[in-house]
């Protein structure tokens, strides 16, 4: 199988999996996950090589405490279901950030592009998120991406720098059930010569 075919197979295998068990599969350790996420944060392309991506991994009591605070902060019982399942059914969460100090420095250094830099930071964060999700899936983990950003920021340990803006949460664990069927829209990529 060619490298591209292997890459595409890995990419298409990545699915949203909500049914998780709070354990790691096989011989996978949290240090393996940390190493993979660290490499992805380092190697994901960024505008002007600015490297604004940051990440932390929550496990154990910290993972449960953060998601418990998120659950309690949401008033609607229906709205509490997803963060409660993240707390109770997942092994951990990768919390993705962008460092606003980096974005502000870019704005000052390159004022002609100042309005674009926040979007550039969002784009590179999205790239790091999907790269991490695909990699964790390839390791045998299941996961789902969440965006309880303000709630998460308020619940995180105090040693997280204030300049870090929460972008997303990749909740992960061992899959407890296969993903549901995925449907596709017609969305052909056209070639114009």
UniProtKB/Swiss-Prot annotation:
Coiled coil: none annotated. Signal peptide: none annotated. Its cofactor is FMN. Its main location: cytoplasm. GO terms for biological process: cellular response to oxidative stress. GO terms for molecular function: oxidoreductase activity. One of its GO terms (cellular component) is cytoplasm. Pfam families: Nitroreductase. The keyword Transcription does not apply. Its EC number is 1.-.-.-. The keyword Oxidoreductase applies. The modification N-acetylserine is found at residue 2. It is found in: Cytoplasm; Nucleus. Belongs to the nitroreductase family. This is Putative nitroreductase HBN1. It comes from Saccharomyces cerevisiae (strain ATCC 204508 / S288c). The lineage of its organism: Eukaryota, Fungi, Dikarya, Ascomycota, Saccharomycotina. The gene is HBN1.
């Amino acid at each position: 199988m060619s490298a591209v075919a292997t890459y595409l197979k890995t990419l298409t295998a990545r699915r949203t999996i909500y049914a998780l068990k709070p354990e790691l599969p096989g011989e996978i350790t949290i240090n393996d996950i940390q190493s993979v996420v660290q490499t992805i944060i380092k190697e994901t392309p960024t505008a002007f090589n600015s490297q604004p991506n940051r990440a932390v991994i929550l496990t154990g009591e910290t993972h449960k405490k953060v998601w418990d605070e998120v659950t309690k902060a949401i008033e609607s019982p229906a709205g509490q279901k997803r963060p409660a399942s993240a707390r109770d059914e997942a092994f951990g969460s990768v919390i993705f950030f962008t460092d606003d100090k980096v974005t502000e420095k870019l704005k000052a250094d390159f004022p002609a592009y100042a309005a674009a830099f926040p979007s550039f930071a969002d784009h590179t964060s999205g790239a790091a998120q999907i790269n991490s999700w695909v990699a964790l899936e390839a390791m045998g983990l299941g996961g789902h991406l969440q965006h309880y950003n303000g709630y998460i920021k308020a619940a995180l340990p105090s040693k997280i720098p204030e300049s870090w803006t929460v972008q997303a949460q990749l909740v992960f664990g061992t899959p407890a059930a296969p993903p549901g069927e995925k449907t596709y829209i017609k969305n052909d990529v056209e070639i114009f010569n």
